[in-house]
Amino acid sequence: MWITALLLVVLLLVVVHRVYVGLFTGSSPNPFAEDVKRPPEPLVTDKEARKKVLKQAFSVSRVPEKLDAVVIGSGIGGLASAAVLAKAGKRVLVLEQHTKAGGCCHTFGENGLEFDTGIHYIGRMREGNIGRFILDQITEGQLDWAPMASPFDLMILEGPNGRKEFPMYSGRKEYIQGLKEKFPKEEAVIDKYMELVKVVAHGVSHAILLKFLPLPLTQLLNKFGLLTRFSPFCRASTQSLAEVLKQLGASPELQAVLSYILPTYGVTPSHTTFSLHALLVDHYIQGAYYPRRGSSEIAFHTIPLIQRAGGAVLTRATVQSVLLDSAGRACGVSVKKGQELVNIYCPVVISNAGMFNTYQHLLPESVRYLPDVKKQLTMVKPGLSMLSIFICLKGTKEELKLQSTNYYVYFDTDMDKAMECYVSMPKEKAPEHIPLLFIPFPSSKDPTWEDRFPDRSTMTVLVPTAFEWFEEWQEEPKGKRGVDYETLKNTFREASMSVIMKLFPQLEGKVESVTGGSPLTNQYYLAAHRGATYGADHDLARLHPHAMASLRAQTPIPNLYLTGQDIFTCGLMGALQGALLCSSAILKRNLYSDLQALGSKVRAQKKKK
């Protein structure tokens, strides 16, 4: 019996290899044939110069001719897809509904200061890391990454017996030692946990492979149990974080501390997979980084590459629908311009608007209910929404004693129970029972801040919320949602500020202004479906190997592709992987192999020097 099983495994592996090799037979140019990184130029601070790149408003005259593709949405998933295609000689138009390009990478002004919308910190940005290498290739090396302090994260547990602090230090050895100092009786558990994190995270390439292989083949591999048998990553994608931590024998408090980073993906330990959690822990374990001059630099240095290939990135361009030809193939988009609709035709349409917006709103009604479309939507649900608080402070980071460290504040070790109770409460009671706060200090992370905004600082607070608490006002115009809406937002702000002032008493009398945005703000500015911070929920169903294989760049609509976080994972690096998967599908090239080859070439050249 075992011989038959072994032969079957070998046969399947041979088939997988042959199919995989046969997938990439396209003749498209290699976008990563040469290293385009060049010495960084001086930072551009002139507002008009930046506006010409980031705020090019849509007009018919600015639409390039003979387009190869149109991208809906200018978040990193959309911009990176466009940039990669541009490097392959494609002329791409990116359409952004907001007034400024960048999606969650854009910044905005408040009370004379600058705030980020979604980039709080990024891991593995040292020279030589693959994420840094990819970004260097689509920005020509113009992004500069500033390392954050160590500890880069500080978990604070507020309990009946007082406050406990758990620092997360940069460097694997230092990270582990920091945990062991807090839990000396659980050193063996910590060692087993960290080894499992390493093994699982290093198998993430299996998730990428699942999205390349034909779906029937992945279903066959899943049916025979080969995915979970041979891939630690796939196996961990069928286990919840809570399940694994309990199996390791961690105490309730250690379980809470090891799970502290959950706000970066928005799901509690019982409802997300250990594989996703391991990816995030491994991503940051060597330390965290922040883009010098803020997150708008990402879009600012990606857009010129798209433009030089004959493409454009246009704002104030709300896409109303994806156009289909008589055969049901995507052939362009319809853009709202004033009271009129402008049709733009192209052979390929790429949506960075998320699965829900794309399938439920942008497709013609005649195809929204196709079996394959409905099947994909049954695998996902909208993710967690958050309320954002933006605080302007008087004083430098030194005067206010602010570090670049992020603060994760919890009030209970049972995160599942606390969150479930919280989101099920009436909205009037919820502010009294906020289960966690995420508090970053953007101004303390940016080395250029003091030159640009002397003697002032910023602080951001993210509070988990239920979209249902704000849903009754979603049809009301921005700024005209009424007293009850503003009162609810203020109640959350006041509850959060009460906690903040206890944590940072030195800020008393230093607060200049406090503003905030609800999930409706995310929905308005970022076109986030139901205000979801991370798109489709990163729960057990979405991250199961079968769903991972099914949710890919290719859609049931020919010539329509998805990019960004909904086809891989959340965050800058997750959305960037989505862009590589999307571009690989369009170009019919294995861009991961192309990047690997270029990386080897660059390393060899450096050795010669």
From Swiss-Prot:
Annotated source species: Rattus norvegicus (Rat)
Membrane topology designation: Peripheral membrane protein
Family of this protein: Belongs to the carotenoid/retinoid oxidoreductase family. CrtISO subfamily.
Annotated signal sequence range: 1-21
Family matches, as Pfam families: NAD_binding_8
UniProt GO cellular component terms: endoplasmic reticulum membrane; nuclear membrane; nuclear outer membrane
Enzyme Commission numbers on file: 1.3.99.23
Expression induction: Down-regulated in mammary adenocarcinomas.
Protein name stated in the entry: All-trans-retinol 13,14-reductase
Cofactor(s) needed for function: NAD(+); NADP(+); FAD
